Every structure is written in structure tokens, then in C-alpha cells.
């Protein structure tokens, strides 16, 4: 089983294109939904999400285990624990958290064979073979990480993070809409849907801002859910819909201001470099002999990367920040939030994959220290551990 354990959603080879929300969700009627059980919800108003991770670290094991239990023991997606597990973890996960993950996998779920790795390592395999060097730009939920991967292994000194992700954009949109239109502060799930449907990355922010002031060419209307004809709402087409009885949000510069904070965090008074400056810093922090290769293999992944205009804006702003003699090339898959999972599928089919894994028998004998050694390359002395 392959598990891309994202901070917003879990992707697995057992669930196809479906995503499992990595959260406990409480409805307005106090019903609690665990992970994929959210599909049973009939009223998406005022949903409250409790997530196991914050700022790129797993902080709540009770929630994470509840979501995993629901996934592993579900009759439709459940797994045979005699099988193997490939699991992703967040960049720069604390060693004790990694050790706890290993313990849960073997002692709680009893998997026979297991490999844990950072998601960026799997992205390096997503093209069908392992790239010698690539730079993974993961625009995720809690934050955006830039990670150099050299010969299939993360180069930790080059990892950089921008503390802006899908969550930040949704919260800003929620506050803006509540100030300008209706009070939507309790409607995180619906506003997140609005963001996904109408927002885009501007290629020239100042120009679009001026255009939005002078004309309505960028304005769209979003019909809010009435829970009779729609549970999540939709973008209004005036030619097809009679809006006289609809409660709608008119969105103009909000459409591109929310994504702009990733490229210019100072908009929300966040004292950090923007995404493209952060990418340039990551490349500069990598070994000199690999910098050109990293520039030519930039892989963009994560849910925020689905926003229209993301790739072209990144290329436009990044080009002046890297040496002119470097060839720059970016890749964005049709489903960038599933690129990591695709890389995992390629890796598990490699003849040497089992050599990367720790078996339950080995874990029972040597414990979590063997996992740390095999997954992260730290020194391990079998004689010392078995003594």
C-alpha cells in the first residue's frame, strides 16, 4: 500500500483518484466524520476541521491514528497487514515523530514490510525513472516547501519553506468575503471550494488590480449553497441561471489577491521571501555542480499548483533570479496533487525496493533505530543494538 500522507488529504493507491480528508470533521448537528466518512455529510455548513498536523509537523497522534484506522480498516480500502507500506512524511520531520510513526506502523498495524520517506523523494520517480537531480516545489495546505533531491535523496541543507499554503489563502478569502459581503467566518469548507473554483494566479498583479478597479471583466459570481439544489455552490453563468433568487458572492480582485500572497507574503505582513526568491535561495544552497541541473528539473506539485496561471507566473518571476546561462524548465502534471503518489507507484515496482524496507522481524529485533538508519542513512551498529 502507498500512502501519501498530506496535511490536507491522504492519497493512496487503494482509493484511486479519491482523496481522504486528513482530519476529524464536526458538522453543525454535532456529527463527527472521520476522514473519508465526510462523503456521508449532507450539510457542509459550519464544518469544523481538526487536523493532525500544523506547520509541517505531526502534532496530534489521536487524530492521525483515527484517520488511519478509518482508512486501513475500511472494507473498501482496507489493507492486508501482511503486505508492505510505503508512507510519506513531511520535510524535516522531527526524529522522535519519525520514530513514533515507525512504532505505530509495526506495533499497532503490524505491517510485514515498510518504507518511510519524504514526499519529494517520490516526486523524483514520478517521470518513470529516478532523476539525478530535481527541485520539488510543493505548494501544499499548511505551507509551501522547496526541496532539492539529488540521486533520489533529499538534500536537507537546501530545503526552504514559505509559510503560505492553501490554508492561508482560504483564511484570507474567508476574512475578505466576510468584510465585504456576508459573514462567512464559519464556512471554511465552502470558502475553500470557492477558492478552488474562481481563484487564479495573476501574471501582472498591479495591472490586474488596476483592471479590476476600472472594469468588471474579471468579476465572477458564485452562487452559495441552498442545500436543495446544491450543497457546495457553483460559478454562475448568467446566460444559464436566473440569479434573482440566488444568494451570490461577487468576486473581483479577490480572485487573484489570495494566490498573490504566496509570491509576495508582505501583502499580509509576513516577513518572508516570496516563492520565487525562496526557490533561488534553495538552488544557491545546493552543491554548485548540481545547480544547473536543478534549474532544468523543477517539478511543481501540491494542491495550490492547480490554480490557473501558477506555472507561468513562477517561470516569469524566477527567470531573472537565476543565472542566465542556466536552462530553466518546469513540469506541472495534470493532477499535481497526485504526482507524489505516481512516483510511489514507480518506486515500489523497482527490483530493489525491498532493500529499502524494514521488515517486522527486523523491527522486532532492532527497533526504531534500524528504521532511522535505513530510511535516513544514520549510523547503526547491529551488535550494539542487539546486546
UniProtKB/Swiss-Prot annotation:
Localization of this protein: Cytoplasm; Cytoplasm, Cytoskeleton; Nucleus
Domain of life of the organism encoding this protein: Eukaryota
PANTHER family the UniProt entry points to: ACTIN
Cellular component terms per the entry's GO annotation: cytoplasm; cytoskeleton; Swr1 complex
CDD domains: ASKHA_NBD_Arp6
GO biological process, one term: chromatin remodeling
GO MF annotation list: nucleosome binding
UniProt subunit comment: Component of the SWR1 chromatin remodeling complex.
InterPro entries for the chain: Actin (IPR004000), ATPase_NBD (IPR043129)
Coiled-coil intervals: none
Name of the protein this chain belongs to: Actin-like protein ARP6
Cysteines paired by S-S bonds: none
Record-stated family: Belongs to the actin family. ARP6 subfamily.
A Pfam cross-reference name: Actin
Function: Component of the SWR1 complex which mediates the ATP-dependent exchange of histone H2A for the H2A variant HZT1 leading to transcriptional regulation of selected genes by chromatin remodeling. Involved in chromosome stability.
Key words, A-Z: Activator, Chromatin regulator, Cytoplasm, Cytoskeleton, Nucleus, Transcription, Transcription regulation
SUPFAM superfamilies on file: Actin-like ATPase domain
Amino acid at each position: 500500500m502507498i500512502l501519501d500522507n498530506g496535511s490536507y488529504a491522504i492519497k493512496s493507491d487503494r482509493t484511486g483518484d479519491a482523496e481522504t480528508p486528513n482530519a476529524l470533521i464536526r458538522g453543525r448537528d454535532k456529527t463527527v466524520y472521520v476522514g473519508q466518512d465526510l462523503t456521508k455529510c449532507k450539510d457542509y455548513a459550519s464544518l469544523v476541521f481538526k487536523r493532525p498536523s500544523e506547520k509541517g509537523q505531526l502534532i496530534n497522534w489521536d487524530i492521525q491514528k483515527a484517520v488511519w484506522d478509518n482508512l486501513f480498516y475500511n472494507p473498501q480500502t482496507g489493507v492486508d497487514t501482511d503486505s508492505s507500506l510505503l508512507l510519506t512524511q513531511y520535510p524535516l520531520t522531527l526524529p522522535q515523530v519519525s520514530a513514533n510513526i515507525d512504532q505505530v506502523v509495526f506495533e499497532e498495524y503490524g505491517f510485514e514490510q515498510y518504507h518511510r520517506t519524504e514526499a519529494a523523494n517520490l516526486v523524483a520517480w514520478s517521470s518513470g525513472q529516478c532523476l539525478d537531480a530535481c527541485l520539488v516545489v510543493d505548494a501544499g495546505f499548511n505551507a509551501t516547501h522547496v526541496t532539492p533531491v539529488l540521486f533520489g535523496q533529499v538534500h536537507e541543507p537546501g530545503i526552504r519553506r514559505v509559510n503560505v499554503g492553501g490554508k492561508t489563502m482560504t483564511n484570507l478569502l474567508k476574512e475578505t468575503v466576510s468584510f465585504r459581503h456576508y459573514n462567512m467566518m464559519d464556512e471554511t469548507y465552502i470558502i475553500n471550494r470557492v477558492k478552488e473554483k474562481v481563484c487564479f494566479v495573476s501574471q501582472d498583479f498591479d495591472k490586474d488590480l488596476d483592471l479590476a478597479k476600472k472594469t468588471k471583466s474579471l468579476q465572477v459570481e458564485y452562487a452559495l449553497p441552498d442545500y436543495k439544489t446544491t450543497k457546495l455552490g457553483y460559478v454562475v453563468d448568467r446566460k444559464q441561471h436566473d440569479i434573482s433568487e440566488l444568494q451570490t458572492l461577487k468576486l473581483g480582485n479577490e480572485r487573484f489577491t489570495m494566490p498573490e500572497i504566496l509570491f509576495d507574503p508582505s501583502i499580509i505582513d509576513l516577513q518572508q521571501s516570496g516563492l520565487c526568491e525562496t526557490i533561488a535561495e534553495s538552488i544557491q544552497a545546493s552543491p554548485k555542480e548540481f545547480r544547473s541541473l536543478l534549474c532544468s528539473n523543477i517539478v511543481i506539485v501540491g494542491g495550490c499548483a492547480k490554480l490557473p496561471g501558477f506555472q507561468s507566473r513562477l517561470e516569469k518571476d524566477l527567470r531573472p533570479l537565476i543565472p542566465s546561462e542556466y536552462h530553466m524548465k518546469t513540469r506541472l502534471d495534470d493532477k499535481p496533487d497526485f504526482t507524489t503518489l505516481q512516483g510511489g507507484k514507480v518506486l515500489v515496482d523497482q527490483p530493489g525496493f525491498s532493500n529499502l524496507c524494514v521488515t517486522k522481524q527486523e523491527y522486532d529485533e532492532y527497533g526504531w533505530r534500524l528504521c532511522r538508519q535505513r530510511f535516513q542513512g544514520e549510523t547503526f551498529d547491529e551488535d550494539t543494538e542487539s546486546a
